[in-house]
Amino acid sequence: MSNGKRLMSTAHDSDLKIVEIKAFPTSFPVKPEDSVSLGVGRAVKRDAIIVKVTTAGGLVGWGESHHGRAPGAVAALVNTTLRQLTLGMNAADVVGVWKKIYDKQLASHGMGAGTCLAMSGIDQALWDIRGKAVGWPVYRLLGGVSRPIPAYAGGVSLGYQPPAELIEEIHPLLAMGYKAIKLRIGDTPKRDIERVTAVRKAFGDALVILTDANTGYDVAAARAAMPGLEANGVGWLEEPFPAQDYRSYALARSFGNVPLAAGENHYTRFEFSRLIEDNVITIFQPDVSKTGGITEVMRIAHMASAYKIQCNPHTSMTGINMAACVHVLASIDNGGYFEGDVSKNNLFRDELVSTPYTVDKNGCVLPLEAPGLGVEVDEDFLIKHPVIEGPSYV
């Protein structure tokens, strides 16, 4: 079928009426041998919330809401208030659905970040439906083209292991094609720099090294670590402090020339506009499962483009989010890296969905070509892996 004929076969508005929204909180335990220590603690389980939106015509869209370390609570918000707000609306009216949730739930007395997490999964599912309705992958709907996007080895990996173990873990990642890796810091400045230095010496200047403190630093630690990070040519220092600690970020800017990165814990374009005004965080990392979905990440990216700020979307838990990130990166002019998930035995990447991306020999990924987000969801997985309440990190 030609592209023109395919566009002519779009569903009628009545077929696109939203008739059901269902969020599925899901978890699996992390084996001790697969657990990684980060600035936020040691992982004991992985959580996710999968959102399913169904239309009157039988189209089904899938999205991921970040669990917010309270998966049952976020899923309940989707299944109650947000469901009631959006039932009966046109699934193609993605902006209208976003605005209604914002006006009625988020803008005033509406649980703030929790609502952003919940609405993000709905938004992704609606984009999935839009693509399926016209037979296009999401990146084409967003105005993008298929092009290689550089990836770095990230996810819940490369934590506080001894330097020799880190080096051993990195070798197979480079064999997979990755040209860039992200090391977890936020332990102590001394041990952090020892790890970064060991990796730099082992692999030379050709390897791009990025770092993520997962909010584990205070101002003194960031000041102590910055010279070593700069000496090793680190590409960025991600989230040294909690997202709303604007004063510490402002102070840290004077500690050296390593760019500060953040955004996975900032919500909606309104919080990102503050980052632009402050001119301290110069690499943005919005998460399509946290900050308001694909719709809002595109707004953030376009806003950042006017200020020459690069966007490197943060990857969440599942292959749904990962596929969505690649679609976004293929559709913006200020995109940077895709965060490849190299965590061990991630069932949300390997079993819940079909393959969300493939890293080629040059360390790049391409957006999926199937209609919508391009991934298929195994609904039996959701039955077999019910939510495990409690903290994800200890």
Predicted feature descriptions by range:
Residues G4-K5, D13-V19, A23-V30, A48, ...:
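Flexible C-terminal active-site loop/helix
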Residues R147-G256:
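Metal-dependent enolase-superfamily TIM-barrel catalytic cores that perform enediolate-based chemistry
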Residues E20-K22, T54-A133:
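Metal- or metallocofactor-binding catalytic centers and their adjacent structured scaffolds
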Residues T80, P227, G233, Q244-C364:
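Shared catalytic-loop signature of beta/alpha-barrel
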Residues V30-S37:
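Short Pro/Gly-enriched beta-strand edge/turn motifs at strand-loop
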Residues I18, G58, L82, I122, ...:
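Conserved, mostly hydrophobic/aromatic
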Residues G61, A151-G154, I181-L183, I209-A213, ...:
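Hydrophobic faces of well-ordered beta-strands that scaffold small-molecule active sites
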Residues M119, D123-G159:
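Glycine-rich, aromatic-flanked loop segments that form ligand/cofactor-binding clefts
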